[in-house]
């Protein structure tokens, strides 16, 4: 039996917003499994907002580079330990160079990106520059993830303050439409282009939660089945791009807009700084003490 510590309870409470005793009980029932405890709280209706479960305090920036012909795009998340460093000019210059070189060389994974020359004919690599930056700034700097998109139509992008970045590929050259759709993806965070592309794992997980809540009503099985089916259908519309109301014209669904424009979204990618990354929390006094000790 796993010992449930106050730190575990604190983390679960921060990630779900549920009451302390509810968090402790959920951890006990799941033998300390944090993700299982989150699901248990959601089924019981104790989590205030499921979206909080994925939020973290990791810092950094999302950088994007687009080719001149708008046929290719490259995006990277570069992380730092603090927001202060994330706004540092040297850090930003490095991050921008990562995007520039990644686009130029057509890489699509972190290892290949780190191995790239920092300049076309340089013997120094991006990894060399990263290490030098760590020594210069005094914080751990990492290229967490990279991605690329290409299209014979157009690749558009949107960046929201360097915290959220989107690449989106259309099958037709429509720069205005692709920009609006990229902005929409940044704001609404759809999981897939269409409902039938939403992962089965996600659907089944949500279905279990809907079923658990519906069963608490005490209604007949056939009614519960209809309730769950309706909730799943509603969810699929909410999490798929084509089923969402367009951010610039809420009266129109994205799917209807695409039909009217005779366009198709081939793919999209959305990065948000710190998604899914756990960061050790420290209070201000601890940070000051750590800096003092580090300067001895």
Curated annotation (Swiss-Prot):
Q: Which InterPro entries match?
A: EF-Ts_dimer_sf (IPR036402), Transl_elong_EFTs/EF1B (IPR001816), Transl_elong_EFTs/EF1B_dimer (IPR014039), Transl_elong_Ts_CS (IPR018101), UBA-like_sf (IPR009060)
Q: Coiled coil where? A: none
For the region Involved in Mg(2+) ion dislocation from EF-Tu, give the residue spans: 82-85
Q: Which UniProt keywords apply?
A: Cytoplasm, Elongation factor, Protein biosynthesis
The entry assigns this protein to a family as follows: Belongs to the EF-Ts family.
State what this protein does.
Associates with the EF-Tu.GDP complex and induces the exchange of GDP to GTP. It remains bound to the aminoacyl-tRNA.EF-Tu.GTP complex up to the GTP hydrolysis stage on the ribosome.
Q: What is this protein called?
A: Elongation factor Ts
Per the UniProt record, the lineage of the source organism begins with:
Bacteria, Pseudomonadati, Pseudomonadota, Gammaproteobacteria, Legionellales
């Amino acid at each position: 039996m796993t010992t449930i510590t106050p730190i575990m309870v604190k983390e679960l409470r921060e990630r779900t917003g549920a009451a302390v005793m509810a968090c402790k009980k959920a951890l006990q029932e799941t033998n300390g499994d944090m993700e299982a405890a989150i699901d248990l709280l959601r089924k019981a209706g104790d989590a205030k907002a499921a979206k909080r479960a994925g939020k973290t305090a990791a810092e950094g920036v999302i950088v994007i580079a687009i080719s001149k012909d708008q046929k290719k795009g490259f995006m990277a998340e570069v992380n730092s330990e603090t927001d202060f460093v994330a706004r540092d000019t040297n850090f930003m210059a490095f991050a921008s160079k990562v995007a520039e070189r990644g686009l130029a060389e057509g890489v699509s994974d972190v290892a290949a990106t780190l191995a790239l020359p920092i300049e076309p004919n340089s013997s120094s690599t991006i990894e060399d520059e990263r290490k030098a930056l760590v020594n210069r700034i005094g914080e751990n700097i990492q290229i967490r993830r990279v991605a690329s998109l290409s299209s014979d139509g157009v690749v558009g992008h949107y960046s929201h303050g360097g915290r959220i970045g989107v690449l989106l590929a259309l099958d037709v050259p429509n720069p205005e439409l692709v920009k609006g759709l990229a902005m929409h993806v940044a704001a609404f965070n759809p999981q897939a282009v269409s409902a039938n592309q939403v992962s089965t794992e996600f659907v089944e997980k949500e279905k279990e939660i809907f079923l658990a809540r519906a069963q608490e009503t005490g209604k007949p099985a056939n009614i519960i089945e209809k309730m769950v089916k309706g909730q799943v259908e509603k969810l699929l519309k909410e999490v798929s791009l084509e089923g969402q109301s367009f951010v610039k014209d809420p009266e129109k669904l994205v799917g209807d807009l695409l039909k009217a424009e005779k366009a198709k979204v081939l793919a999209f990618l959305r990065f948000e700084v710190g998604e899914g990354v756990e960061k050790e929390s420290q209070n201000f006094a601890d940070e000051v003490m750590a800096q003092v000790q580090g300067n001895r």
